[in-house]
A protein has these predicted regions:
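An N-terminal, globular interaction/scaffold subdomain
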Residues: 1-102
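C-terminal transmembrane-bundle signature of multipass membrane proteins
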Residues: 14-26, 220-308
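Membrane-helix interface "capping/anchor" motifs
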Residues: 29-41, 100-110, 233-246
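Hydrophobic alpha-helical transmembrane segments and adjacent interfacial helices
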Residues: 44-65, 93-101, 116-133, 195-211, ...
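Hydrophobic cores of alpha-helical transmembrane segments in multi-pass inner/ER membrane proteins
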Residues: 15-25, 82-100, 161-176, 223-229, ...
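Generic multipass alpha-helical transmembrane bundles of integral membrane proteins
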Residues: 106-239
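Membrane-interfacial helical/loop segments at transmembrane boundaries in membrane proteins
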Residues: 1-2, 62-76, 132-154, 265-292
Length: 308
């Protein structure tokens, strides 16, 4: 099994997944259906959170206990989380500019390249993180290393292979000059984002989370990837990349403020790499003594293969 879902917490883990999936689908609809929803989600909310994050780090620099013990500061302090949050939010804002034809940018044919650029940047952020894990592991054969957030990661050749798959995925994007707004202005449509590309992207990105966010992947890997795909398949065909950006940005905001939902609650779910050690091994004070990377290797091979 890819995830450790069993015992007394299994019901809560499944419930948590359903809540995250449904919540992301609903929030995406709020953000995409009106200007007010989009502005609230991707301009007002990120601005307020930025003030909150700055206050935390200023407080921590001054030695304030409330800041040093803040969940965001303790559990979500890596460069990756902030880079992903703001890159995804930038994508959402850019997509709204195109969708609503705001200003000269929104009416410019040249700005249609923006979605390709911002998606490529988001992919490269993850690729850099994958390569970092391979280096920090100390051996391509596999090795444990402790992240800045206190989670043990098992890096190795699977990170390198998945990183290469991410680079290939960038070159799989085509047709951005054909991007246009739907007649009702609810969606920015990228017709060339067909199911073949979505499948390749989803497998690659799921593997990224599986390798590098093993305490979050059940939610940010599985639920977060299926929510935009579900919506695009059923009611806003061609709008997958917009759905993906919206749900990613919203999830990053939630996870940054409420990290214990994934890290230390009855909903916490970890991958199979920790073996019998489970959650205790993932966030323990000492290096895990068991590693089961079989699933990591298999998914990386699949990720590379589908992107080739």
């Amino acid at each position: 099994m890819f995830f450790q879902i069993y015992g007394e917490t299994a019901g809560w883990q499944l419930l948590g997944w359903l809540l995250v999936f449904a919540g992301l689908v609903v929030m995406n609809e709020i953000a995409r259906r009106s200007k007010a929803g989009g502005i609230a989600c991707f301009l007002i909310l990120p601005a307020a959170l930025s003030v909150y994050f700055i206050a935390i780090y200023v407080g921590a620099a001054m030695g304030a206990d409330w800041a040093l013990n803040n969940d965001t500061y303790v559990h979500m302090n890596s460069w990756f989380h902030y880079a992903k949050l703001y890159a995804a939010t930038a994508g959402c804002i850019g997509f709204m500019i195109l969708k609503y034809h705001w200003g000269k940018l929104g009416k410019s044919h040249g700005f249609k390249a923006f979605p390709f650029i911002i998606v490529a940047i988001n992919i490269l952020i993850a690729v850099a993180s994958d390569f970092e894990s391979a280096v920090r592991a100390g051996s391509l054969a596999g090795g444990w290393w402790l992240s800045s957030e206190g989670v043990w990661l098992y890096g190795g050749w699977w990170n390198v292979l998945n990183g290469l798959a991410g680079i290939l995925n960038i070159f799989c994007m085509t047709g951005w000059w054909g991007i246009y707004s739907s007649k009702d202005k609810k969606d920015m449509l990228w017709p060339d984002m067909i199911w073949v590309y979505v499948l390749a992207y989803d497998i690659w990105n799921f593997q990224y989370t599986y390798l590098n966010l093993p305490t979050h992947s059940w939610y940010c890997g599985l639920a977060l990837l299926l929510a935009p795909t579900f919506a695009a398949a059923l009611w806003n065909k061609g709008g997958w990349i917009q759905n993906r950006a919206n749900t990613l940005a919203l999830w990053c905001m939630f996870a940054q403020v409420f990290p214990l939902f994934q890290d230390a609650s009855r909903f916490t779910t970890v991958t199979s790499v920790y073996g019998q050690g489970g959650i205790a091994a993932a966030m323990g004070s000492s290096m895990p003594t068991i590693a089961e990377p079989t699933a990591q290797g298999i998914i990386s091979v699949l990720s590379f293969a589908v992107n080739v």
